[in-house]
Structures are given as C-alpha cells and as structure tokens.
Amino acid sequence: MDAYFDEEDKKRRAENVYRQYPVLRDKKVLLYAPTFRATAEENAQLLEKFDIAKICQTLGDDWYVLVKLHPKFPSENITLHEHCLNMTDYSDITDLYMVADCLVTDYSSTVVEYVLLDKPIILFAYDLDKYDRGFYRDYRSTVPGDIAYSTEELLQLLQKNVDNAQKRQDFAKLQYDYIEGGSLDRVFAILQKE
C-alpha cells in the first residue's frame, strides 16, 4: 500500500501510462473498472448499461474514458468511442489509478485501493437488487461514493462533478488502521521485536 503514498512512484506509474498513451496527457480521465459477472449475459450488460457514447458526450472533449474489464472478459467485444480506450489488457491497474481523476465501478475491490488516492468515486450499481455475491458490510451505507442505479443517474452524477470526500474518508477508516503510508516500516519494526 505504500505505493499510494510515494509521490515519486505515483509519478513514475502515471508516466508509464502517458508514455504508452500520450493522448491522455493533459486530459481528465475517468476509469471504468467493474467486477466480473457470473454469466455472459450479465457481462454483456456491463457495457450496455455503461453507455460509452453518452458518457463521452456528457464529459466532453477534455475527458477520456478508460475501460478496464476483468481479464476473463473478451476484450474484442468492446465498442469504443474516439475518447475511450480499452485498457482491459493493460497489466497493472495501479498505473491507471494514478492517471484517473475519477473511478466508476460497482462491487469491485478496486475501491479499497483507489480510496487511498482520495479521488472521486462513483458506484454504478444498476443491478444491485440482483447481485448475489454478498458484501462484508451494508453496501448502500458504506461505499466510498455516490451510487448510480441507472445510466441516467450515472450521467447526472458525472455532470455534477461529484466529490464525496467524507464518504471516502469514512470508507478508508473502515478498511485501514493506518492511512499515511509507512506499512513496510511498521512490519519491519514488528519483525525486529520478535
């Protein structure tokens, strides 16, 4: 987790992305990283509900949308827009976190790491009532961002330029005992005591 607090490492990771995708430099970036679903039909809905054309139109030319689906998702099925890049085959999602200005996800564990960067998060839970994999905590009351239950609600949240800082802070406190880095030093100190 220390990588999320090391400014040099964050810059290096962002530069990895910019070197490969220079069009992203000086643009705002929305990262869409949903969790994998059990059936092909449910997985197809991930991109039907996340209407890339409408989202790109709503965000405007200053934004790029990065789509990072689960590696099991057939990435050739992704229809893109001129302001959207398929990053499904990109090897390290942490690099993508560093260039993203906002994360859109659903039930994915990506929020547990991304929340450490203290950037806006939107939860796109269009199928919450049907999603049956269970949660450790009550989803609606503990997620680190605003929830959109439909494509229209997602578009509205994107237009509002959501912040949700308090929700992120509350979520981070639920997940972590320490939120300032230094994990390696703490582990080393414990090992030295033994």
Residue ranges and their predicted role:
Residues 79-80, 109-176:
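Catalytic binding pocket for nucleotide-activated donors in carbohydrate/polymer assembly enzymes
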Residues 1-42, 166-170:
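A nucleotide-sugar donor-handling region in carbohydrate enzymes
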Residues 44-52:
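Charged helix-capping and loop-helix junction motifs
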Residues 29, 64, 101-102:
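Structural motif
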Residues 1-2, 35-39, 71-74, 92-93, ...:
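Short, solvent-exposed loop/turn segments at secondary-structure junctions
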Residues 71-112:
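Donor nucleotide-activated moiety binding/catalytic core segment of transferases
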Residues 180-194:
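C-terminal alpha-helical cap of glycosyltransferases
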Residues 32-33, 37, 53-88:
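Catalytic donor nucleotide-activated moiety binding site of glycosyltransferases and closely related
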